Structure formats: C-alpha cells, structure tokens
C-alpha cells in the first residue's frame, strides 16, 4: 500500500492495482496544489461525510474520470441528484468487496450536512482491508470508545486521524485514539488548513514520540509506503 497526501483530509491510496481517493478537497484548499484536480485518476472516490472540506471536488473528479463514489446513503442520493449516476451507497456497519479487498464504513462522532444545507446522513470513517495491510481513516471525529472495538476487530497497520482540534480531535485525543486502536502507526490529517486547526508540528511529533507511537505528518504531494 502507498499513501499520497493532498492536504487537509484528502489522500490517495494505492492498493493492489487500484487507486482510491478520499475526501477530495483541493480547489478550495489554499495549501493544496490545484493542478491535482485535473491529474488525479482514481478508480474509486470515498467520502466520509458531507461537509464542504471533504466533498468539494468529488463531483468534478467523478465526472471527469467516471470513478464510482462510495459514501453513506444520503450523500450518494444527493450526488445522484447532482447528475452522478456512478454511486455505491453504504451505511454504518456495512462493507463492500472489491478486487483489492474490502471497504468497511464505520462510525465517527461528528456532524454531517451537505454544501447546500441538505441532510448528509451520519458521518463515518473507512477501514480498507486487503492482503497488503489494513488502513483506518477516521474521517472527522471526536475520540470515541468505538475505536477500541475497531482495534479488536482489525489489526490496523496505519490510522489516519484528525489532529487539528476545534472541529475534531486534537493531538492529545489522537494519541488516546491510537492506544484504543492498537495501530502500528498514525498519520495526522485535518490540520493547518484553516486558522482554527493550526498545530505545532514539533510539539505534536514529540507527544507521539513520548508515547512510543510512530507518527507521520506528510507535506502536500508527499507519499508514504507501507
């Protein structure tokens, strides 16, 4: 597996011969590279919840590439009304199987509404399970006890956790989440994009190091091989 970071909570995952794109937010992200909007070619697009900073570029990328979009029932229904027919609805506790493995849609503790104010269903996260390893993407979430169950059900190789605080967990809560998940390493997401979620990088790294948790902060367009 190989992770490509595109800023905020947007990242790509190479798994098997497939490329998955999560929570596309590029054109409105001042820290991302706008050329990515025309160069990314995912086979699948995964959306954790309906907030603009996770869904803003899903439609243009899906229309250009014809990539199916996986998300909860309400979001996929809304996307169909926007003219996208290639949707794969899911909901909490459900999973779908693919050539590269299995995708589970799991709980997150967060709100969800769509850019036009429509109801966005319940926010979620994703666990991607394949022969190359297991990735947990928390989406936007608070610390929650369900993470202990995720760690019991899956041997998580890497957890992508929000660390910016204010709207999600901060660094301290992400450390507690990592212990609950019993994951092998953590990659931080959902930080620095806006003033309210800026973090001290060195302080965050030290806090994870003090807890003996391998931790990565990637720059935009930087990659991580698992």
Curated annotation (Swiss-Prot):
**Annotated HAMAP family:** UPF0173
Q: Which InterPro entries match?
A: Metallo-B-lactamas, RibonucZ/Hydroxyglut_hydro, UPF0173, UPF0173_UPF0282_UlaG_hydrolase
Gene3D superfamilies assigned to the protein according to its UniProt record, in alphabetical order? Ribonuclease Z/Hydroxyacylglutathione hydrolase-like (3.60.15.10)
Protein name as it appears in the record = UPF0173 metal-dependent hydrolase Minf_0129
Q: Which residue pairs form cystines in this protein?
A: none
Which Gene Ontology molecular-function terms are recorded?
A: hydrolase activity
Keywords linked to the UniProt accession: Hydrolase
Q: Which Pfam families match?
A: Lactamase_B_2 (PF12706)
* Similarity section: Belongs to the UPF0173 family.
């Amino acid at each position: 597996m190989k992770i490509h970071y595109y800023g905020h909570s947007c990242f790509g995952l190479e798994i098997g011969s497939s490329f998955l794109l999560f929570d596309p937010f590029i054109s409105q992200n001042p820290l991302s590279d706008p050329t990515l909007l025309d160069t990314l070619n995912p086979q699948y697009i995964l959306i954790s919840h309906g907030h603009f900073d996770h869904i803003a570029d899903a439609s243009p990328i899906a229309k250009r590439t014809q990539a199916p979009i996986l998300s909860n029932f309400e979001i996929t229904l809304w996307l169909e009304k926007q003219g996208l027919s290639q949707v794969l609805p899911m909901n909490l506790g459900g999973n779908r199987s693919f050539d590269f493995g299995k995708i589970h849609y799991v709980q997150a503790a967060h709100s969800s509404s769509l850019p036009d104010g429509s109801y966005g269903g319940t926010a979620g996260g994703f666990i991607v399970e394949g022969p190359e390893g297991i990735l947990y993407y928390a989406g936007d979430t608070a610390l929650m006890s369900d993470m202990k169950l995720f760690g019991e059900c899956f041997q998580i190789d890497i957890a992508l956790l929000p660390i910016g605080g204010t709207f999600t967990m901060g660094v301290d809560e992400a450390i507690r989440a990592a212990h609950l998940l019993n994951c092998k390493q953590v990659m931080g997401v959902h930080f620095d994009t806006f003033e309210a979620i800026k973090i001290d990088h060195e302080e965050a790294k030290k806090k994870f190091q003090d807890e003996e948790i391998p931790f990565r902060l990637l720059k935009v367009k930087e990659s991580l091989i698992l």
